[in-house]
UniProtKB/Swiss-Prot annotation:
PANTHER family: LEXA REPRESSOR (PTHR33516), LEXA REPRESSOR-RELATED (PTHR33516:SF2)
Protein name: LexA repressor
Signal peptide: none
Species in which this protein is naturally found: Thermosipho africanus (strain TCF52B)
BP GO annotations: DNA repair; DNA replication; negative regulation of DNA-templated transcription; proteolysis; SOS response
Length: 198
């Protein structure tokens, strides 16, 4: 199944709750009223949920939405490679997806995967060839592992922001931290999981 946007997840949660409380599905007008949308706007979200495989419905019946049993996995895009080292050129767009356990993500947000190249994160059990699952976000707390861009290169490191500097710390005791000006560093995602394919 495809990942949901925040609004699609909210609409799906509303449909689920409505069915549990009433024993039948909401109409497009019920959904529109709840979210303060036009009927057309609500219809677009329902069509997206149907296309992504979360619901089925009969367009000829206004209360015909049925929930599809949620799968144990979801597909997210693989955006390219990320260095677990000194950094590699910005990742290229790759037309690839990877299946991950649904429990790895909370349904909200934008998730993507990158394939790891290098050994700078081995003490965090992230090795060359692993896929790191990242939640797209631009700010993270100190001490979190993040995908960051600096000098037009992307790398995976533990992130520390101190005043006007950023310290990118490897999880490999044989390697040194990278220290850069904060203005030259951009966080692109927070690590939420690792997939290893044998």
């Amino acid at each position: 199944m495809k990942e949901l946007t925040n609004r699609q997840k909210m609409v799906l949660d509303f449909i689920t709750s409505y069915i549990q409380q009433n024993g039948y599905s909401p109409s497009i007008r019920d959904i529109a009223k709840h979210f303060k949308l036009t009927p057309r706007g609500a219809h677009i979200h329902v069509l997206a949920l149907e296309k992504k495989g979360y619901i089925t419905r009969n367009p000829k019946n206004s209360r015909s939405i049925s929930l599809v049993k949620r799968p144990e996995t979801v597909s997210i895009p693989v955006k390219g490679k990320i260095s677990a080292g000194q950094g590699i050129e910005m990742f290229e767009l790759v037309d690839e997806e990877i299946e991950i356990p649904v429990r790895m993500i909370n349904g909200y947000g934008n998730y993507f995967a990158l394939r790891v190249e290098g050994t700078s994160m081995i003490e965090a059990h992230i090795i060359d060839g692993d896929y790191v699952i990242l939640k797209k976000q631009y700010r993270i707390p100190n001490g979190q592992i993040a995908a960051v861009v600096f000098d037009n290169k992307v790398t995976l490191k533990r992130f520390y922001h101190k005043n006007d500097k950023v310290e990118l710390v490897p999880e490999n005791s044989s390697m040194s931290p990278i220290i850069c000006d904060a203005k030259d560093v951009k966080v692109i995602g927070k690590l939420v999981g690792v997939i290893r394919i044998y």
